[in-house]
Regions:
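Short glycine/threonine-rich loop-to-helix capping motif typified by GTGT followed
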Residues: 294, 320-324
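Active-site donor-binding acidic/aromatic loop of nucleotide-activated sugar
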Residues: 337-341
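Catalytic-core elements of nucleic-acid end-processing and repair enzymes
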Residues: 348
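A short glycine-/small-residue-rich loop at the edge of a beta-strand within enzyme catalytic domains
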Residues: 259, 283, 287, 314-321, ...
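N-terminal localization/anchoring segments of enzymes in phospholipid and broader phosphate metabolism
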Residues: 1-265, 270, 274, 298, ...
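Helical hairpin unit composed of two closely spaced alpha helices linked by a short loop
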Residues: 285-307, 311, 316
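A short, conserved beta-strand element enriched in hydrophobic/aromatic residues
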Residues: 199, 282-283
Length: 381
């Protein structure tokens, strides 16, 4: 059946075509790689892997703000959205037509009235139960351009297994947001279906936002036949004068089931293998391959402090039971697993040896690592 799935083959060709036009627009920033290799070689090797295999470069000249709660990210996001002058791009796995989204929509409508271009992109399956089928029409009626990824149609469609799990906001090509949270009330603890909700995110300002822009445009253009040769790519991807206060390096990257490279998993495994002192993760689901299990256990056997935080209250009991089934095999080799008892930990993060970290959408979960469209940020300091 997989071999006969012409829809998936067609999509692979389409993504390859769009990437061949978009990704070369990013600078290769070889001087940044050279500086990292001189100062933190183990991090430089991972940055080189990402750049060679996903074509997303490493940047400096970018300030990063970390949010330890999703609502803090939302509040900052609302402030930045209200300042938009040219364009706003938003891509999320789930949007709920409720309080949190209404705060965003109010600002988007105001910006549209002063000439700001606004594009919204969401995953249909991820938003089922959150919005009605007329959501796109409602957005278009107020001047907000809206597209849906892979609309759900009952029947045999193997491509339905590939969902858009990315979470990105880009404002004027200068400010960007990503992390674990979607645009639904539960993520901001406006509602509490699973106790307290724990999520994290980051705000970028500076050169690295270009990569988030490319990631958004890839998905936006992939779902419309007429946009593969969009002549307007250049007006959204540009360098502007910005002087960052921070001196670290950041590398936004994307992972896709439309190629044969599992960038998200390889970055995690590489970080684990490079760890010398500690390697810590937060993930809502823990359903991992033998390769990752081996890497985690081997690191613990080397004396690395390996810790994984998972939820104390699950959103899906069946998946929770599978997650817990991995505990014994890890713990017996020295990996420490903690459950976040106040509620559901949805954050997707890692930090290694005080010099490397990731934040984004990629879970320690087979679906996330192999089947979904994902994005992350690799950070070095």
């Amino acid at each position: 059946l997989i071999g006969l799935n012409g829809g998936t083959h067609k999509m692979r060709e389409r993504y390859a075509e769009i990437d061949s036009k978009l990704l070369p627009m990013l600078s290769d920033n070889q001087e940044c790689l050279s500086r990292i290799n001189e100062t933190i070689p183990k991090a430089g090797n991972i940055a080189s892997y990402i750049q060679r295999n996903s074509q997303y470069p490493i940047y400096q000249n970018t300030d990063v703000m970390y949010f330890d709660e999703a609502v803090k990210g939302l509040e900052t996001q609302l402030e930045d959205l209200a300042k938009a002058q040219k364009f706003i791009f938003m891509e999320y796995h789930a949007i709920e037509d409720a309080e949190a989204w209404h705060k965003i929509q109010k600002i988007l409508e105001e910006r549209v009235k002063v000439g700001v271009e606004v594009r919204i992109f969401y995953d249909d399956m991820g938003s089922i139960g959150f919005i009605n089928t007329d959501f796109v029409k409602k957005m278009e009626c107020v001047g907000i351009h809206c597209r849906v990824f892979n609309p759900f149609v009952p029947g045999l469609n193997l491509f339905l297994n590939n969902r858009d799990h990315r979470k990105i906001t880009v404002i004027d090509g200068k400010v960007g947001f990503t992390g674990g949270y979607n645009l639904a009330n539960e993520y901001f603890n406006y509602t509490h279906p699973y106790g307290q909700w724990k999520d994290t995110g980051i705000r970028l300002e500076g050169d690295a936002v270009q990569s988030l822009t490319v990631t958004f445009l890839e998905m936006w253009n992939a779902v419309s036949d007429k946009d593969a040769n969009d002549p307007d790519f250049g007006k959204y991807i540009f360098h502007y004068d910005y002087k960052a206060q921070q001196t670290g390096f950041i590398q936004p990257y994307a992972d896709s089931p439309m190629d044969n490279e599992q960038v998200g998993e390889e970055v995690y495994i590489s970080m684990i293998n490079k760890a010398e002192k500690y390697c810590w993760f937060m993930t809502p689901y823990l359903i991992i391959t033998d390769e990752m299990t081996h890497a985690l256990c081997l690191a613990a056997k080397r004396g690395v402090d390996v810790r994984i935080i998972t939820p104390g209250i699950p959103d899906k009991k069946f998946i929770y039971n599978i997650t817990r089934s991995f505990y014994h095999g890890l713990v017996k080799h020295g990996v420490r697993v903690y459950e976040w008892t106040p509620g559901f930990c949805h954050a997707k993060m890692s930090v290694v040896d005080d010099c490397m970290a990731t934040c984004g959408t990629i879970n320690l979960d087979y679906r996330s690592l192999y089947h979904h469209f994902e994005n992350g940020c690799f950070m070095i300091d």
